[in-house]
Amino acid sequence: MAASLAPVRSHARTWITAASLFVVSCVVGLWVLHQTHRWPKGDGPHYAIMTSSLVNRGSFNVKPSYTSGDYIGIFSAEPLDYHVNAQYFSPDSPAWYTYHSFGLPLLLAPFLLAGEALHIPALYALQIGMVLLQALGVVLVYLYALQLIRQNGAALVAAITLLGSMSYLGLASSIYPDVLTATILVGSLLCLERLRRKPRSLLPMAILSALAGFAPYLHVKTGLMSVTLLALGLWHWWRNGRSRKALTPRGAGRGVEGGSSPLAQLACLLLPAGLLLAGYAVAIHAWYHTWVFTAPFSNGLLFHFPPGKSIIANLFDTSRGILPNNPGYLLILVGLPLWWQRDRRSALVALVVLLPSLLLQSTFADWAGGCAPAGGRYLMPFVFATLPAVAFLFAELRWAFRLLMMVPIAAGVIMGVHYTQLDFVCSYAGDLNPMLVDWLAMHHIRPDFAIPIFSHDLNLNGGLGTTLLLIGLGVALAMLLAGIVIAQRRSRSAMANSDDSQVGATALRG
């Protein structure tokens, strides 16, 4: 009886933890919202204007709002620059469509409608919507890590590492698509893992297809990620559904081993993504009169830099880098070798999905995310997808070392809370990290330690900037080396236990 109830208890614990984590994430997001200035930063007002245009005019045409200024006092305190691609629109064009993708306004439109019905200010309704959608991302990180590691506490630590980090808190409630893009990515990886354990399940395949099809709606640069995810789904279908048994009339009609048929699974993979991508292409053609749906949004920004260099900048720059601003993320580097050792297949899947998109992202001219919070918002999808490494590390260590893990996580929380409470105006690549400048001033430390390592043009600042980069590289390599040592010790321990078991079995037979 107890054994039969164990799966039920496990599922109940998972969903109770997920629901609790969602509530906590919403509370954190609302706290951040009440610490910050009223007006959204960076591209936020433009996404808000797009949402308002959709709800109030039934179109993404932003020309009436831009020209009339009806957004002033609602989404912005002052007039905005027109975020319109001049290659496609002129002042005399009857309609203007921005160079921002329209997926985020689509997701936020229901919250704006609900806000109008409940007499909630329009901007506040959109920000609450962002809090709820971003909280889903934290929950999916937990579920993805749990799917891989099968240890509730370890998966929860991975999610908390994200929730308390400065990069997440800096984006919480902000109207940027990066956390939602990361949510779609980690949700897709979760679907692939579910398919790995239930190869002929239809629901994970359909959700994977829908997520991959919707990703370009959030940002056109996710197109490569979508293609990779769909290719992995097709590879899974071919490997698990095209067996000789499945190709027989009986197998094709009823499926194999009680599962769904290969044709049904193929339909679940192709139809949602196909319909979404076709709708996206038709909309882009109607607005911009081109079937090259990347053209209106790239605006000459892609392939500006050679691949790779901006990855170093996004990792180690004192202002825009994710590692100096998020000590907890260093645990990812320690955990990666353990992930590779314990579950190489899932690690390879993540690598195949992430690496092409990361290299493409590294060619982007605006490498640091424009006017954005410190901490590298463009790398958030890659952070989400690699956070299970923290869970693998936690599961491997004993309690004393687990407590030691809490030090960088707690340091990240302190930095994130401090950054949020100071409510700095967003900054650009090459600008000083305002939080670091404030902290150095408080402790009477040389302010040039806050110098950005890289300029806006990705030039390395000499002198102290070079020294800081070398220190950062040294710390990162030390973290990776520590992970390799832990993984090797685990491997030797497993081999020793296996040898002892064989000796014991031989003695019993004797």
Language model feature labels by segment:
Residues M1-Q35, W39, S261-P272, I471-G510:
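Start-transfer (signal-anchor) and selected internal transmembrane alpha helices
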Residues N56-Q127, F297-F305, A365:
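Interfacial juxtamembrane loops and adjacent helix segments
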Residues A125-I149, T183, G187-S188:
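Transmembrane-helix motifs of polytopic, lipid-linked glycan transferases
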Residues I149, S188-M205, A215, R239-S243, ...:
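Membrane-interface transmembrane helices that cradle and orient dolichyl/undecaprenyl
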Residues S167-L180, G321, G375:
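Short acidic/glycine- and proline-prone juxtamembrane loop motifs at membrane-interface regions
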Residues P216, W235, R239, S261-G335, ...:
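Membrane-lumen/periplasm interface segments of specific transmembrane helices
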Residues P324-L351, T386-L393, W399-A410, I471-A494:
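Hydrophobic, aromatic-rich transmembrane alpha-helices
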